[in-house]
């Protein structure tokens, strides 16, 4: 974050999703503060947030993803041959939004919330307004943006105090767009049968064409439209976060097709793909779900 704020390139510390882990730490710490105030912890978090705010100011448009900005600045959201499944651009912004909501609830401080709303507005304008098919290649933002929608809907005074361009319904629209655009892609690369390196090269060569996007495969629940999926598939954390987001969205939009889809997936998961311990994700390779009733004693499990 400090390097982004200074406008330098290179030398990112760790993989792209480390941004998200920092935001998740803030979210978790905020929950502690909500139940038990701790001035020392709050001061420490305020220091982190100040550095995040400074980094967010560098782009000038609300975008903040330290890996992409330091290492691949021409590849925002996987454009120009970038690899979004690695970059985690959408995931990280979702984690920021969720952290900001939790931190405001705990402290009523708005610095991180302003950063998050600017990022949310940017991503709405870039994806929804332009009707791009981009979806989170790692779910999590779905639930986070619903939380932002609810926070602003339930606190009109907060909206007024922030003095930002805020229409909370845009964030719910964006989540529906993400959910309903899974499976809507160029039908390639063939992650199920191809070599990963070949698939990545296919993406970097932009063989998906203009005004389209690559598939992220069943690993990222992108093999068919979300609301048509019959079994829970792929990376266990991604899959459970996706359908948690669908549940959150259904509680707001009350669309029957959302309810039907999540009940179907829930039944498949808990009756056929969950260990007696409650763990899911039987296969270590790709940390993913197995077939129905594939529940070995030496399973991976999340």
Predicted region positions:
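Glycan-recognition and catalytic cores of secretory/periplasmic carbohydrate-active enzymes
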Residues: 1-302
């Amino acid at each position: 974050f400090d390097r982004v704020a200074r406008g330098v390139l290179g030398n990112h510390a760790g993989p792209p999703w480390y941004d998200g882990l920092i935001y998740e730490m803030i979210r978790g710490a905020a929950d502690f503060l909500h139940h038990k105030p701790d001035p020392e912890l709050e001061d420490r978090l305020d220091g982190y947030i100040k550095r995040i705010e400074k980094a967010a100011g560098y782009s000038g448009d609300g975008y903040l993803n330290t890996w992409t900005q330091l290492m691949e600045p021409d590849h925002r959201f996987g454009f120009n041959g970038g690899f979004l499944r690695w970059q985690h651009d959408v995931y990280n912004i979702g984690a920021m939004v969720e952290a900001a909501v939790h931190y405001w609830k705990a402290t009523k401080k708005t610095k991180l919330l302003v950063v998050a709303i600017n990022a949310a507005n940017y991503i709405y304008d870039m994806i929804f307004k332009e009707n791009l098919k981009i979806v989170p290649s790692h779910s999590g933002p779905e639930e986070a943006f619903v939380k932002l929608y609810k926070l602003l809907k339930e606190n009109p005074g907060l909206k007024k105090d922030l003095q930002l361009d805020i229409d909370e319904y845009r964030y719910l629209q964006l989540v529906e767009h993400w959910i309903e655009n899974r499976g809507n892609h160029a039908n390639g690369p063939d992650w199920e049968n191809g070599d990963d390196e070949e698939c990545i090269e296919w993406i970097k060569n932009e063989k998906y064409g203009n005004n389209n996007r690559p598939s992220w495969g069943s690993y990222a629940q992108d093999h068919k439209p979300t609301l048509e999926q019959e079994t829970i598939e792929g990376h266990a954390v991604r899959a459970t976060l996706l359908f948690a987001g669908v549940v959150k969205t259904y509680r707001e939009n009350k669309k029957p097709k959302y309810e039907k889809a999540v009940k179907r997936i829930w039944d498949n998961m808990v009756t056929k793909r969950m260990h007696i311990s409650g763990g899911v994700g039987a296969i270590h390779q790709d940390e993913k779900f197995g077939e129905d009733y594939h529940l070995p004693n030496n399973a991976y499990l999340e």
